[in-house]
């Protein structure tokens, strides 16, 4: 099995019996966290990590580009598409996506050099506002905003979760990661 994942995405493999899965592609539905390992964005699942068997892998980028939607059998376009598939399996409780695990200054630097830096700069958010957003435990941007709305600024409220919901390594080593736990 080949898993493609960003460095800030940790797939949860604990409850998966890979021998029983017959689907061509696995999509991991992951909880999304900001700033700390236990500050979760509620009511949102990230689908960054994907997997397939080695013999099905065309390229890592092909797997990364797969749409995170299961298409109906009557969708004729799925026969000719390299990104639309019907034979997906979504892995619920599929892991953790840790984004912006940085302080305010590092987040500002990231967003200024980020792909959407023009959108960030158009919102006129400064370092003090980023610090305020982090202290109030809100997401730096709204992941549900479309292009007509302002994405950056005060996003949804984050919730603090119990340590039993974070990866075992983090849970078992709180002294190492205490700075990154709220």
Each language-model region and where it sits:
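C-terminal accessory extensions appended to soluble enzyme cores
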Residues: 86-182
